[in-house]
Amino acid sequence: MNVISAFVVNKTITVNDEFNALAIAYARAANMDNQMEGAIQKLNLAKSIARDAEAIGAEMVVARYLGIADFEPTLNTFKNSADVGSRIEVKHTSWRDGHLIVKPSDRDTDLAVLVVGESPNYTIIGWIPVSIAKTPKFKSDQSNSWWVSQINLRPMDSILKGVEWSR
Protein backbone atom coordinates (compact mmCIF):
# COMPACT_ATOMS: atom_id res chain seq x y z
CA MET A 1 0.00 0.00 0.00
CA ASN A 2 1.33 3.42 -0.91
CA VAL A 3 -0.31 6.70 0.12
CA ILE A 4 1.49 9.87 -0.91
CA SER A 5 0.67 13.34 0.39
CA ALA A 6 2.48 16.54 -0.44
CA PHE A 7 4.89 15.92 2.41
CA VAL A 8 5.00 12.28 3.54
CA VAL A 9 4.63 8.76 2.18
CA ASN A 10 2.72 6.06 4.09
CA LYS A 11 3.70 2.46 3.36
CA THR A 12 2.90 -0.94 4.83
CA ILE A 13 5.09 -4.03 4.67
CA THR A 14 3.77 -7.60 4.47
CA VAL A 15 3.95 -10.27 7.16
CA ASN A 16 6.56 -12.03 5.03
CA ASP A 17 8.59 -8.78 5.00
CA GLU A 18 8.32 -8.66 8.79
CA PHE A 19 9.64 -12.23 9.09
CA ASN A 20 12.51 -11.39 6.73
CA ALA A 21 13.33 -8.26 8.74
CA LEU A 22 13.36 -10.26 11.97
CA ALA A 23 15.61 -12.94 10.45
CA ILE A 24 18.10 -10.32 9.26
CA ALA A 25 17.98 -8.48 12.61
CA TYR A 26 18.67 -11.77 14.41
CA ALA A 27 21.58 -12.55 12.06
CA ARG A 28 23.02 -9.07 12.59
CA ALA A 29 22.82 -9.45 16.37
CA ALA A 30 24.38 -12.93 16.28
CA ASN A 31 27.37 -11.59 14.33
CA MET A 32 28.05 -8.53 16.48
CA ASP A 33 30.51 -8.51 19.36
CA ASN A 34 28.76 -5.66 21.18
CA GLN A 35 25.20 -5.01 20.07
CA MET A 36 24.89 -1.87 22.19
CA GLU A 37 28.10 -0.17 21.09
CA GLY A 38 27.24 3.30 19.83
CA ALA A 39 23.52 2.90 20.54
CA ILE A 40 21.74 5.85 22.10
CA GLN A 41 19.15 3.52 23.63
CA LYS A 42 20.65 0.74 25.73
CA LEU A 43 18.21 -2.14 25.16
CA ASN A 44 18.38 -5.81 26.06
CA LEU A 45 19.09 -8.26 23.24
CA ALA A 46 15.45 -9.14 22.47
CA LYS A 47 14.37 -5.49 22.33
CA SER A 48 17.44 -4.61 20.28
CA ILE A 49 16.56 -7.28 17.69
CA ALA A 50 12.96 -6.03 17.56
CA ARG A 51 14.15 -2.43 17.13
CA ASP A 52 16.55 -3.46 14.36
CA ALA A 53 13.80 -5.46 12.62
CA GLU A 54 11.62 -2.35 12.55
CA ALA A 55 14.55 -0.33 11.17
CA ILE A 56 15.02 -2.96 8.44
CA GLY A 57 11.32 -2.60 7.62
CA ALA A 58 11.97 1.14 7.27
CA GLU A 59 14.78 0.38 4.81
CA MET A 60 12.38 -1.82 2.83
CA VAL A 61 9.79 0.95 2.46
CA VAL A 62 12.40 3.50 1.37
CA ALA A 63 13.79 1.08 -1.22
CA ARG A 64 10.30 0.46 -2.58
CA TYR A 65 9.55 4.18 -2.68
CA LEU A 66 12.70 4.68 -4.74
CA GLY A 67 11.70 1.86 -7.09
CA ILE A 68 14.38 -0.64 -6.06
CA ALA A 69 12.53 -3.92 -6.65
CA ASP A 70 15.45 -6.23 -5.80
CA PHE A 71 16.41 -4.59 -2.48
CA GLU A 72 18.20 -6.85 0.01
CA PRO A 73 18.99 -5.49 3.49
CA THR A 74 22.68 -5.64 4.30
CA LEU A 75 24.35 -7.81 6.89
CA ASN A 76 27.39 -6.54 8.79
CA THR A 77 28.29 -3.64 6.51
CA PHE A 78 27.76 -1.15 9.35
CA LYS A 79 28.66 2.32 8.08
CA ASN A 80 30.85 1.09 5.20
CA SER A 81 27.97 1.12 2.74
CA ALA A 82 24.58 2.75 2.41
CA ASP A 83 21.38 1.15 3.68
CA VAL A 84 19.62 1.63 0.33
CA GLY A 85 21.21 2.21 -3.06
CA SER A 86 24.68 3.66 -2.79
CA ARG A 87 23.89 6.87 -0.85
CA ILE A 88 20.76 6.45 1.27
CA GLU A 89 21.08 6.12 5.04
CA VAL A 90 17.69 5.27 6.56
CA LYS A 91 16.97 6.62 10.04
CA HIS A 92 14.02 5.09 11.88
CA THR A 93 12.14 5.94 15.05
CA SER A 94 8.87 4.64 16.40
CA TRP A 95 8.07 8.16 17.63
CA ARG A 96 5.63 9.87 15.23
CA ASP A 97 7.17 13.29 15.91
CA GLY A 98 10.71 11.93 16.28
CA HIS A 99 13.91 13.45 14.97
CA LEU A 100 16.32 12.22 12.33
CA ILE A 101 19.48 11.43 14.33
CA VAL A 102 22.89 11.47 12.65
CA LYS A 103 26.02 10.09 14.31
CA PRO A 104 29.69 10.88 13.62
CA SER A 105 30.04 7.49 11.89
CA ASP A 106 27.42 8.41 9.25
CA ARG A 107 29.05 9.12 5.89
CA ASP A 108 29.02 12.79 4.90
CA THR A 109 28.31 11.92 1.25
CA ASP A 110 25.07 10.07 2.08
CA LEU A 111 21.49 11.31 2.16
CA ALA A 112 19.62 10.53 5.39
CA VAL A 113 15.92 9.64 5.17
CA LEU A 114 13.66 9.69 8.24
CA VAL A 115 11.03 6.96 8.59
CA VAL A 116 8.67 6.87 11.58
CA GLY A 117 6.21 4.25 12.77
CA GLU A 118 6.04 0.67 13.92
CA SER A 119 5.97 -2.43 11.79
CA PRO A 120 4.08 -3.02 9.57
CA ASN A 121 3.00 0.64 9.16
CA TYR A 122 5.60 3.25 8.30
CA THR A 123 5.65 6.89 7.24
CA ILE A 124 8.56 8.25 5.22
CA ILE A 125 8.87 11.84 6.46
CA GLY A 126 11.69 13.44 4.47
CA TRP A 127 15.41 13.62 3.88
CA ILE A 128 18.53 15.74 4.33
CA PRO A 129 22.14 15.41 3.18
CA VAL A 130 24.21 14.04 6.06
CA SER A 131 26.77 16.83 5.55
CA ILE A 132 24.04 19.42 6.20
CA ALA A 133 22.69 17.50 9.20
CA LYS A 134 26.19 17.56 10.73
CA THR A 135 26.17 21.31 11.25
CA PRO A 136 26.17 23.22 14.56
CA LYS A 137 22.48 24.08 14.10
CA PHE A 138 21.50 20.45 14.71
CA LYS A 139 24.22 19.41 17.21
CA SER A 140 22.80 17.81 20.33
CA ASP A 141 24.10 18.98 23.68
CA GLN A 142 23.01 15.63 25.17
CA SER A 143 25.09 13.27 23.00
CA ASN A 144 27.68 13.20 20.25
CA SER A 145 25.02 13.36 17.54
CA TRP A 146 22.93 15.73 15.46
CA TRP A 147 19.13 15.82 15.82
CA VAL A 148 17.20 17.16 12.83
CA SER A 149 13.54 17.98 13.47
CA GLN A 150 11.01 16.98 10.84
CA ILE A 151 10.31 20.57 9.79
CA ASN A 152 13.95 20.82 8.64
CA LEU A 153 13.70 17.84 6.27
CA ARG A 154 13.18 18.07 2.54
CA PRO A 155 10.01 16.50 1.09
CA MET A 156 10.39 13.00 -0.31
CA ASP A 157 9.24 13.88 -3.81
CA SER A 158 12.31 16.10 -4.14
CA ILE A 159 14.66 13.14 -3.64
CA LEU A 160 13.35 11.75 -6.92
CA LYS A 161 13.95 15.02 -8.77
CA GLY A 162 17.49 16.06 -9.53
CA VAL A 163 19.21 14.08 -6.80
CA GLU A 164 21.48 11.26 -7.85
CA TRP A 165 20.92 9.07 -4.81
CA SER A 166 21.81 5.86 -6.60
CA ARG A 167 25.37 6.78 -7.57
Model-derived segments and spans:
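Nucleic-acid endonuclease domains
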Residues: M1-V84, K91-R167
